[in-house]
Structures are given as C-alpha cells and as structure tokens.
A protein has these predicted regions:
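Short, conserved loop-to-beta-strand elements that form functional interface hotspots
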Residues: 61-72
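Ribosome large-subunit tunnel/peptidyl-transferase-proximal elements
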Residues: 1-38, 42-57, 61-62, 104-111
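C-terminal structural segments of small proteins and small subunits
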Residues: 74-102
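Short Gly/Ser/Thr- and Asp/Glu-enriched loop/turn motifs at secondary-structure junctions
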Residues: 29-31, 68-70, 77
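Conserved hydrophobic/aromatic beta-strand scaffold that supports enzyme active sites
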Residues: 37, 72-74
C-alpha cells in the first residue's frame, strides 16, 4: 500500500501538483483507506494531472470511477480516493478540515 501511495504522490509531484496531502483513514469510519488531495494550477492542469495518473498507474491500478470537471477531479481506486482541485475549489470546499477530523478521530465533529 505504501508503494502505491508513494507512486501516486510522486506522479502528482513530478507533474507540478501543489500542496499534496495524504490522509491515512485505515482505522477510521470511512469508505477508503487513504485520501489524497492535490492542487492543480488551473483547469487544464487538472485534466493533465489525471492523464498523468492514468498513464503512470495503469495497468497496476483499476480506476473504479472518475468524476471529472475542470475544477475538481475525483479518482476512486477502491481503497484510495484522489482529489485534484484548483486552488479556488480547494479553498472553497476545505476537504483538509473534514479529512483531518476523520484522521484525528473526530468523526462526529461538525466542520
């Protein structure tokens, strides 16, 4: 699992994603083991990062579902969820606060 996370982070980093964060949710009441959030430089870069992930992770990874928009892409690998967001969407939706509360065992806290 750690190798998979490292490969995802490396792919995002090598392709100029910003503020990459990994949340370990294995012991929490969440539907995936890990969540990864990364910022893109803009809409075109968001799609480019998705293309790089597809190129670098296939055929090892099965992309169960991909929700695409220029501002926010969610990649579901089954046990890992990857969020690629423009800085504006990342600020607006503040997924870090939600995922940090889960990772720190505060599942019931309101955000």
């Amino acid at each position: 699992m750690e190798d998979r996370i490292e490969k995802i982070v490396q792919t995002l980093d090598n392709n100029k994603a910003d503020e990459i964060e990994v949340f370990d949710l294995r012991e929490k009441n969440y539907f995936v083991d890990y969540a990864i959030i990364a910022s893109s430089l803009g809409s075109k870069h968001t799609f480019a990062l998705l293309d790089h992930l597809r190129d670098d992770l296939k055929p090892q990874e099965k992309f169960i579902n991909v929700e695409e928009s220029g501002d926010w892409i969610v990649v579901d690998l089954g046990d890992i969820l990857i969020h690629i967001m423009t800085p504006e969407y990342r600020t607006k939706y503040d997924m870090e606060t939600f995922l940090s509360s889960l990772a720190n065992g505060r599942e019931g806290d309101t955000i």
